[in-house]
């Protein structure tokens, strides 16, 4: 017997776990009792419990000791004690993968599986299937078939679930049990029917036609199990998504009919499936929303929670569809369950009118301190969405957020608030000073280094442009005096930006920099010394290059290049142009709030998609002399989705070459493709110099082939080209079941869509946080200006979107957002042209009958300016 502990022990935590200090060696020593005669079921049961506890705690058992314990345990089958026997089954399952010769218990388990004791049969089947491999499965196949159609539900369910696990190991054998599974699917028992449907689906899931037939059969005949109905809804929903069938499909009609089912679980599953369907209109959502509305007034808390949580998701995309539920949601604000109340309010914030915002904020503030951090983050996300919807309400939101910022809370909660305030500042320039003041107050007592450095970065970026920049200096310098090394270093960088932008503040900033040069940390001292020297030069170009805009290279790429440079000493200085550019600008601040689950911060910066491509291409000998990878495009589809071969292309741009990576998938199971390459015919002076074929392309296994193209040297302005593409390969027919190919093959080809190279393939986006400084830094030596009429464009928003996508450059200073009711706008774009040449574009837009655009281009290379203007023209 396990000693009963009193409540006091339980609360203190001492003694609440009788197995807390178990030692593996002692337990294995105790296991020798299994060999004693007569068997003591009670003691053996306790020892087996200890072994399972140790295994579940992750204790490592060596193969020898595990096998010895396993063999000793097999003697316990001589006992007729029911509890001990079932504990043996559990132990067999746990030790199946770490012991040798576990098949020794096969005969004992088979005997129990076919015996008269129903209480043994189900667990024996599960244990037997755990230790059975492909070679032994046929020996028990007859028993498994009988068990699947057994009249005892627990036996039938055990056989079905075990079969489901064995599908991964022996698909071909389990496939022969389909008839028995279909018979079990007509069982009156709800669990047997559910498990039978699950097995049937997993046997057929790779055959869309078979799944469709199965769905048609069960949707017409009906089911008794609500669990099976839920699975059927999920299968139908998945099939709808894969086939991109419209809402006129019989499958959608079936899901909609489940909204009228008698079982609440089925009704909710159907409503949830409709809500999560892509491209669902408000009209198609209406029946699902009506059902969820009814659930909002259910006496069951779980139903109310499910309904309001799902409505919350609907409100993100279709707020108008949820408006009809506002009254029910308002009733849930006072719900005794705080999670339900929070979700109700955040849903109302997404669907409510501008006039209801203040009232809702007041209601939230009354209980926000009582809810968990996870739900506080949900509230902050709703407020962030509301700020974008009703920008005029930013002051009310800002006050509410600042109060929340003062409350106690974890890192994720505080980060969500800080991100929300930053997004309000960026969306509403008039709220900048208020927001910065709240953030300054927060960093005075901030225990999170990540947040403090983020806010200091924002102060350095936005503070110098405010009417009174001097008031932020005190808050920043306080961090240098009081905080950790990382925060002090960030504060030094922020101070430098004030000195670089404001001549009046420069003397004061230089004095503070001198103090920072005496810091105990070398990172802080180095930064202070560096900025001190740059600021003393009083040159705007230097300030722009080294203080405002910083590096725009890939950090993992820079690390690798510097390491390579140190391994091979050279008299030449390190060339920054040898480092790949960052695909996502380092300085870009994303204010999207991350989910609460991601509380662990990455210790090392993960390599970007482009860094991975750089490594993959560098491993191919033919591409090793091309230099650093400049840019990789998004994949371009060259075939339709449902064709026999699926081909997509990724364009990799280098200084003087382009590599075209063709990712090919063979969707025919009766063919093996070999020596696969894509032949390219250019329309311009581009020259294909090498093909690297994919050696083999088996069914459903993607492979890559490459084409190397030289860019025209004699005409650097030739940035656009169209390639006609043909896939060529050797076909070998093969057996669809075994995949065994014929000895002989034949050559064949497949015409692909044309592939275009355009201006964005030669330009990498680079964010310039201070565009004005970058504009001055590049200078007007190669500045050119032209005016264009965009006759077909009707709005400034459309014009801005078209220019950005056409040039493939990075919008700066949030100039991609056009203010409301404006007839003119200025768009700032920045990028780096192939070869490492900075290029900046200023486009002045005016709206009249169409849109008139005055484009000014600056670059460090005249050819680049000509390329941009020629492409726009």
UniProtKB/Swiss-Prot annotation:
Pfam families: Adaptin_N, Coatomer_g_Cpla, COP-gamma_platf. Residues 1-11 have a biased composition (Basic and acidic residues). Keywords: Cytoplasm, Cytoplasmic vesicle, ER-Golgi transport, Golgi apparatus, Membrane, Protein transport, Repeat, Transport. GO terms for biological process: endoplasmic reticulum to Golgi vesicle-mediated transport; intra-Golgi vesicle-mediated transport; intracellular protein transport; organelle transport along microtubule; protein secretion. HEAT repeats lie at residues 64-101, 283-320, 321-355, 356-392, 394-430, 467-504. It is a peripheral membrane protein. It is found in: Cytoplasm; Golgi apparatus membrane; Cytoplasmic vesicle, COPI-coated vesicle membrane. InterPro entries: ARM-like, ARM-type_fold, Clathrin/coatomer_adapt-like_N, Clathrin_app_Ig-like_sf, Coatomer/calthrin_app_sub_C, Coatomer_g_Cpla, Coatomer_gsu, Coatomer_gsu_app_Ig-like_dom. Oligomeric complex. The coatomer is a cytosolic protein complex that binds to dilysine motifs and reversibly associates with Golgi non-clathrin-coated vesicles, which further mediate biosynthetic protein transport from the ER, via the Golgi up to the trans Golgi network. Coatomer complex is required for budding from Golgi membranes, and is essential for the retrograde Golgi-to-ER transport of dilysine-tagged proteins. This is Coatomer subunit gamma-2. It comes from Takifugu rubripes. The gene is copg2.
């Amino acid at each position: 017997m396990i000693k009963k502990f009193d409540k006091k022990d339980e609360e203190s935590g001492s003694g609440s776990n009788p197995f807390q200090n178990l030692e593996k060696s002692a337990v294995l020593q105790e296991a020798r009792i299994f060999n004693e005669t007569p068997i003591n079921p009670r003691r053996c049961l306790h020892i087996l419990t200890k072994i399972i506890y140790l295994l579940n705690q992750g204790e490592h058992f060596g193969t020898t000791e595990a096998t010895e314990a396993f063999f000793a345990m097999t003697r316990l089958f001589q006992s007729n004690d029911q509890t001990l026997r079932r504990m043996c089954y559990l132990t067999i399952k746990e030790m199946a993968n770490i012991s040798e010769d576990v098949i020794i218990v096969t005969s004992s388990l088979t005997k129990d599986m076919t015996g008269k004791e129903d209480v043994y049969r189900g667990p024996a089947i599960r244990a037997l299937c755990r230790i059975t491999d492909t070679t032994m499965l046929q020996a028990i196949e007859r028993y498994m078939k009988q068990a699947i159609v057994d009249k005892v539900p627990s036996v039938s369910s055990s056989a079905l679930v075990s079969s489901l696990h064995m599908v991964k190991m022996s698909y071909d054998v389990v496939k022969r049990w389909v008839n028995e599974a279909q018979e079990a699917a007509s069982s009156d028992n709800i669990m047997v029917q559910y498990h039978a449907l699950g097995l049937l689906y997993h046997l057929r899931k790779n055959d869309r036609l078979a799944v469709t037939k199965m769905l048609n059969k069960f949707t017409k005949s009906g089911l008794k199990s609500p669990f099976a109905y839920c699975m059927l809804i999920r299968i139908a929903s998945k099939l709808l998504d894969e086939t991109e069938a419209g809402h006129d499909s019989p499958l959608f009609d079936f899901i909609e009919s489940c909204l009228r089912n008698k079982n609440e679980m089925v009704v909710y599953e159907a409503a949830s499936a409709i809500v999560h369907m892509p491209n669902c209109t408000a009209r198609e959502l209406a029946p699902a929303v009506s059902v969820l509305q009814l659930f909002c007034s259910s006496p069951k808390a779980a139903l109310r929670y499910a309904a309001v949580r799902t409505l919350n998701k609907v409100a993100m995309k279709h707020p108008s569809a949820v408006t009809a539920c506002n009254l029910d949601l308002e009733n849930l604000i006072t719900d005794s369950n705080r999670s339900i109340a929070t979700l109700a309010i955040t849903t109302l914030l997404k669907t409510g009118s501008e006039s209801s915002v203040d009232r809702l904020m007041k209601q939230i503030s009354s209980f926000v301190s009582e809810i968990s951090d996870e739900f506080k983050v949900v509230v902050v996300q709703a407020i962030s969405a509301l700020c974008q919807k009703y920008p005029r309400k930013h002051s009310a939101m800002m006050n509410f957020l600042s109060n929340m910022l003062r409350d106690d809370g974890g890192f994720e909660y505080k980060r969500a608030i800080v991100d929300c305030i930053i997004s309000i500042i960026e969306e509403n320039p008039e709220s900048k000073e208020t927001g910065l003041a709240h953030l300054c107050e927060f960093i005075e007592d901030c225990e999170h280094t990540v947040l403090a450095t983020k806010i200091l970065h924002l102060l350095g970026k936005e503070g110098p442009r405010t009417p009174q920049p001097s008031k932020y200096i005190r808050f920043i310098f306080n961090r240098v005096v009081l905080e950790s090394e990382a925060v002090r270093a960030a504060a030094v960088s922020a101070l430098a930006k004030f000195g670089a932008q404001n001549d009046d503040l420069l003397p004061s900033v230089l004095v503070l920099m001198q103090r920072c040069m005496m810091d105990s940390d070398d990172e802080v001292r180095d930064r202070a010394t560096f900025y001190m020297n740059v600021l003393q030069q009083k040159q705007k170009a230097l300030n722009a290059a080294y203080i405002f805009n910083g590096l725009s290279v890939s950090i993992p790429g820079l690390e690798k290049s510097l390491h390579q440079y140190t391994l091979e000493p050279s008299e030449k200085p390190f060339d920054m142009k040898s480092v790949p550019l960052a695909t996502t600008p380092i300085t870009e601040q994303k204010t999207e709030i991350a989910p609460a689950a991601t509380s662990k911060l990455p210790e090392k910066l993960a390599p970007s998609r482009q860094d991975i491509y750089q490594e993959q291409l560098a491993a191919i000998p033919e591409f090793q002399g091309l230099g650093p990878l400049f840019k990789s495009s998004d994949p371009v589809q060259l075939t339709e989705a449902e064709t026999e071969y699926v081909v997509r292309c990724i364009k990799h741009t280098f200084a003087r070459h382009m590599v075209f990576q063709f990712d090919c998938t063979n969707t025919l199971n009766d063919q093996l493709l070999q020596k696969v390459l894509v032949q390219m015919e250019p329309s311009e002076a581009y020259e294909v110099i090498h093909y690297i074929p994919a050696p083999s392309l088996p069914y459903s296994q993607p492979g890559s082939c490459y084409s190397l193209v030289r860019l025209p040297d004699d005409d650097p302005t030739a940035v656009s080209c169209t390639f006609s593409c043909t896939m060529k390969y050797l076909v070998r027919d093969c057996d669809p079941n075994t995949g065994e190919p014929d000895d002989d093959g034949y050559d064949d080809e497949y015409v692909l869509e044309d592939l275009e190279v355009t201006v964005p393939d030669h330009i990498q986006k680079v964010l310039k946080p201070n565009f004005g400084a970058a504009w001055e830094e590049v200078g007007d030596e190669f500045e050119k200006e032209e005016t264009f009429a965009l006759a077909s464009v009707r709005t400034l928003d459309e014009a801005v979107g078209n220019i950005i996508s056409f040039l493939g450059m990075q919008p700066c200073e949030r100039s991609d957002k056009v203010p409301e009711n404006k007839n003119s706008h200025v768009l700032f774009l920045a990028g780096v042209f192939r070869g490492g040449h900075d290029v900046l574009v200023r486009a002045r837009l005016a709206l009249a009958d169409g849109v008139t655009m005055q484009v000014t281009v600056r670059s460090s290379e005249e050819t680049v300016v000509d390329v941009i203007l020629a492409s726009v023209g």
